[in-house]
């Protein structure tokens, strides 16, 4: 009999403690954000959607060197090189399968022209998996991205309309890397 009364007192105490705890949490600041109305805080170096940028002249920065595809641990990047009449390389097609991408950022680190960059955009939900395969037209943005003044061909040098490398306007003289060796 005393055991039965002890169980009732113990159960009532547990219920009262739970009610006090719930009542106390009702006046605290909410941890949950109302997502669409309140934007989510993202870290400054958050790695989200991948984009292809343009150089300051408005041309594609990508030179189809294939380093991003080689660096990708899951193999979600595919591209094919083409060449313009003046010898400039560009990707004939550039494709990223975001259903396989792990957003590790290795492609961005491998890119010598800073053409491929990760943005803080994370809203990429789709109903069909095929819609997560982005082509070059979907990835290209109108601006230069994180490095607005960098132009790969000004740094690397390229013969333009009969001029030798380094003789064009705003182009630095090419550096002989063998002269830099110790």
Swiss-Prot record:
[4Fe-4S] cluster 1 binds at residues 62, 65, 68, 111. GO terms for molecular function: 4 iron, 4 sulfur cluster binding; iron ion binding; NADH:ubiquinone reductase (non-electrogenic) activity; quinone binding. It is a peripheral membrane protein. It is an enzyme of class 7 (translocase). GO terms for biological process: aerobic respiration. Its EC number is 7.1.1.-. It is found in: Cell inner membrane. NCBIfam families: NuoI (TIGR01971), PRK05888.1-1 (NF004536). Belongs to the complex I 23 kDa subunit family. This is NADH-quinone oxidoreductase subunit I. The lineage of its organism: Bacteria, Pseudomonadati, Pseudomonadota, Gammaproteobacteria, Pseudomonadales.
